[in-house]
Amino acid sequence: GLLYGNGDAVIGINPATDNVAQSIRLMQMLDEVIHKYDIPTQSCVLTHVTNTREAIEAGAPVDLVFQSIGGTEATNTSFGFGLSDLAETRDAALALERGTVGNNVMYFETGQGSSLSAGAHHGLDQQTCEARAYGVARHFDPLLVNTVVGFIGPEYLYDGKEIIRAGLEDHFCGKLLGVPMGCDVCYTNHAEADQNDM
């Protein structure tokens, strides 16, 4: 991503593992690169919030805390955390005082369909659940909230048109609710979509 100038707000890595030691190594590597080249940015390893708390306790250089969030308690429980986990880890990150401007130490990902796929929507539609997720995000004063709605797959968003519609809904809904909203251009390979749709 850096080759294309991506990652100006944050350089993030998805470790594709729940191994805390590996996440710490990635955090240290990113911290070294940022300091060596004096890059005016911050880093985030996209590991579970409880792993990040462990990393902080082990002395890791954590700039941003990541977590995928949903709009119901049951959705977040299915993701393996509660709001108290977000609060405790946010407090731990703030205590590190690594930020140069502001206290925005949280990075969240969301996207329509997660509450439905978890059987945790309580009869609400996808967009209502998504709007509730932005309420959760706003409470924690995040640096960035990103919808990754294309990752939900054709079980909930069948094709490129539906993915684009949902991404626009998410983006505008997030903006209306006052969160720093982004939209990841993504889709699953088994959806009726391709790069030309995005």
Write out the residue ranges for each language-model feature:
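Anaerobic metallocofactor- and corrinoid-dependent redox/one-carbon enzyme cores
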Residues: 2-3, 8-198
